[in-house]
Regions:
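Short, well-ordered alpha-helical scaffold segments within catalytic/effector domains
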Residues: 160, 183, 253-257, 282-285
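Extended, H/D-rich, highly charged conserved domains that either
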Residues: 2-251
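Generic recognition of flexible, low-complexity loop/linker segments
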Residues: 163-167, 174, 256-262, 286-287
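SIR2/sirtuin-family catalytic core signature
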Residues: 1, 259-355
Length: 355
C-alpha cells in the first residue's frame, strides 16, 4: 500500500520507542515521518488506499465500496481521457481495490475469527439470549409485540385469521437470516434459536463466507444498478468496468435464488439488525423492500452513550433515511417502516477472546 525508508531512524532509541508506542495508524505515521524527515519519506504504491485515508468520512466498509464506485464514475465520465487511457486507469483501480479487499479478509481473520469465540459459550446465557425476544416468531398471543401497529389493519387481521385456522405445524414461524457479514458471528443468533421448535430457521450468507475460496467467496464491491450512471458504464461494453459489481458475484452460487424463492413464497417482515442500508447494496435491498410480500420493516438501532451511561444519540433516523433511498415509491416506504416508538436498540454482545 505504501513504502517508507524508516530503517535509518529506528536505530535511534528515542525514535524507535516513539515508533512503537505512538504510531498505530496512517496519520500518526505521517506525524512520525515529519519529525524525522531528514532520514525517511513516505510513498504510496496504492492510490485508492491513499484516497481512503484522505477521506475524513470513511467509517464503514460501505464507505470504501462507495468510494470505489465514485472513482469508477470519475474515470468513466472524464472527457479529457482517451478510451484506452480510461481502460488502463480502470485496470489499475481494480487491482488496487483487490489489494484492499485482500487486506479486509486478512483483518477479519486476524482480528475477529482468530481472536474471538464466535461459538456459543457455556455459562454465558445472559449474553447469548439477548436476541431471543427479537427473533421470536410473530404471534398475536405475544402481548409484548404491538403487531396491530407494526402492520397494516388488513395484514393484522390476516395474521389473526391464520392463527385461528391453521394447525400448529402449519403456523410455525419462519426465520431467514440474510447475513451481510463475512464472518460466522451472526450464526450465534440462529444457534440460540435452535432451542425454539416453533421457528423454522435458515441462514443465507449473501455476501460470502470468510475462507471459502470456491463457491462462496466474499462479495466486496458495489451493488447499485439503480444509479443514473450505471447504464453509462454498462454501455461501454467492457467487462473490466463491471468487475466489482455485486450482482455478478451473486450468480456464482444459489444464495440469491434462495432469497428470491423465500420472498416470493409468503408475506414477511424485515428486521434490520446492524446493517447501515447503504447504497452499495441498493439493488438487493430494493428487491426485498419494494416486494409486494414485504409488509413491514422494523429497525433495531444503535445508541451512543456518554461516560455516565446516558444515551446522547442514536442512528434510527440515519438508517431510515438510508432505507428511503432504496424505494422508488416513497409512499410505500412510509407505509412499511415501523415508527421509532415501536422499535428498540440492538442488544450489544461482548464476545469473549480465545485463550
Amino acid at each position: 500500500m505504501f513504502t517508507s525508508n524508516i530503517s535509518g531512524v529506528v536505530n535511534n532509541y528515542q525514535a524507535k520507542e516513539h515508533l512503537k508506542q505512538n504510531v498505530n495508524n496512517l496519520e500518526t505515521l505521517k506525524g512520525f515521518i515529519s519529525n524525522y524527515e531528514r532520514y525517511c519519506s513516505l510513498e504510496f504504491t496504492n492510490n485508492f488506499f491513499l484516497n481512503i485515508n484522505n477521506k475524513i468520512n470513511v467509517e464503514k466498509w460501505v464507505d470504501i465500496e462507495n468510494l470505489y464506485f465514485y472513482q469508477l464514475k470519475v474515470i468513466t465520465k472524464l472527457s479529457s481521457l482517451k478510451l484506452e487511457d480510461k481502460k488502463r486507469q480502470v485496470k489499475v483501480l481494480n487491482a488496487e481495490f483487490e489489494e484492499v479487499k485482500n487486506l479486509l479478509e486478512k483483518y477479519l481473520k486476524d482480528k475477529v475469527v482468530d481472536l474471538y469465540n464466535l461459538e456459543l459459550i457455556q455459562g454465558s446465557d445472559l449474553e447469548q439470549f439477548k436476541f431471543c425476544d427479537i427473533l421470536r416468531p410473530i404471534s398475536i398471543f405475544n402481548e409484548e409485540l404491538s403487531l396491530e401497529q407494526e402492520f397494516s389493519v388488513f395484514d393484522y387481521e390476516e395474521l389473526k385469521d391464520d392463527f385461528e385456522t391453521l394447525s400448529a405445524e402449519k403456523s410455525k414461524g419462519f426465520l431467514r437470516l440474510l447475513n451481510f457479514n463475512y464472518t460466522g458471528t451472526a450464526l450465534r443468533y440462529l444457534r440460540v434459536q435452535n432451542l425454539n421448535d416453533d421457528l423454522e430457521k435458515t441462514h443465507i450468507p449473501i455476501h460470502g463466507a470468510l475462507g471459502d475460496l470456491n463457491d462462496n467467496k466474499i462479495n466486496f464491491g458495489f451493488g447499485d444498478e439503480m444509479d443514473e450512471d450505471y447504464k453509462l458504464i454498462e454501455n461501454l461494453d467492457d467487462n473490466k468496468y463491471l468487475r466489482n459489481f455485486k450482482s455478478f458475484q451473486y450468480l456464482q452460487n444459489s444464495n440469491y435464488k434462495n432469497l428470491l424463492d423465500y420472498i416470493d413464497s409468503a408475506k414477511y417482515q424485515v428486521l434490520i439488525m446492524g446493517h447501515s442500508c447503504g447504497l452499495s447494496d441498493r439493488t438487493l435491498l430494493n428487491t426485498i423492500f419494494e416486494h409486494v410480500n414485504c409488509r413491514s420493516i422494523k429497525v433495531f438501532f444503535h445508541e451512543t452513550k456518554d461516560e455516565k451511561g446516558i444515551v446522547i444519540k442514536d442512528n434510527y433516523t440515519e438508517i431510515i433515511q438510508n432505507i428511503s433511498r432504496h424505494f422508488n415509491k416513497k409512499k410505500l416506504m412510509r407505509e412499511k417502516i415501523v415508527n421509532k416508538t415501536l422499535c428498540q436498540p440492538l442488544p450489544q454482545i461482548q464476545l469473549s477472546k480465545k485463550v
